[in-house]
Design a protein with these regions (language model features):
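Divalent metal-cofactor coordination and adjacent catalytic microenvironments
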Residues: 1-208
Length: 208
């Protein structure tokens, strides 16, 4: 998606006659820099290892957002218990072999998303503790994240990338249009310190 509309050009210091292809290319550079498909609302799926003896995980793409008519940002949610290593089984009164017979570890369990405590801005999900006190080992989450309205700093960054491109000798600034792939080729130099600072809050978290 384009992060600037034609009606925004003058507001952000661009010529009103700027071709939308410049904005399209600059928006693609922003997506690549932020390691996201888009900063708009999008659906993601992540399979995440649960930290030992904790019942929380953090999603990579923020903020989590609810898409009507849903009542939660989570679309589907599954989790499973891991097979403990030697000496880690916490219930001496119940043998691990007994638990395995009833498929406690290793099996995926569907969880009602409405039972999860969600922090939309941090992306943290807190799971209820199992009746036996067991912790999940891994979770698979399908969720919605992004912005319905593109934040102003992202729009400023988009305009700045276009300005940087138009000031780059290697680009054909005589043409009103710019090839997207050509502009992306120069992406490393077009994303200057100012742009990096503006986009820092919108980067995907962890290794996404």
């Amino acid at each position: 998606m384009n992060y600037l509309a034609t009606t925004d050009y003058l507001t952000y210091g661009l010529d009103a006659a700027t071709d939308p292809s410049w904005i399209t290319a600059a928006s693609a550079i922003i997506d690549a820099h932020c390691r996201r498909m888009t900063l708009g609302v999008n659906q993601y799926q992540e399979r995440v290892k649960m930290p030992p003896e904790l019942n929380t995980v953090r999603m990579s793409y923020l903020p989590l957002v609810t898409v009507a008519p849903a009542t939660t940002p989570l679309v589907t949610l599954q989790a499973r218990y891991g097979i403990p290593r030697r000496g880690e089984w916490p219930f001496p009164e119940m043998s691990l072999e007994f638990a395995l017979v009833f498929s406690l570890p290793g099996m995926w369990t569907t969880i009602d998303p409405t039972t999860i405590d969600i922090s939309p801005n941090s992306g943290e999900l807190t799971f209820p503790v199992n009746a036996l006190g067991l912790f999940f080992n891994e979770v698979d989450v399908v969720y919605n994240a992004g912005w319905n309205t593109i934040p102003v700093p992202v729009q400023v960054a988009c305009a700045q990338i276009v300005k940087n491109a138009q000031a780059t000798p290697g680009l054909n600034v005589k043409s009103s249009r710019i090839d997207r792939m050509r502009l992306e080729y120069f992406g490393g130099t077009l994303v200057d310190d100012t742009v990096r600072s503006l986009l820092a809050p919108y980067m995907a978290q962890k290794g996404a």
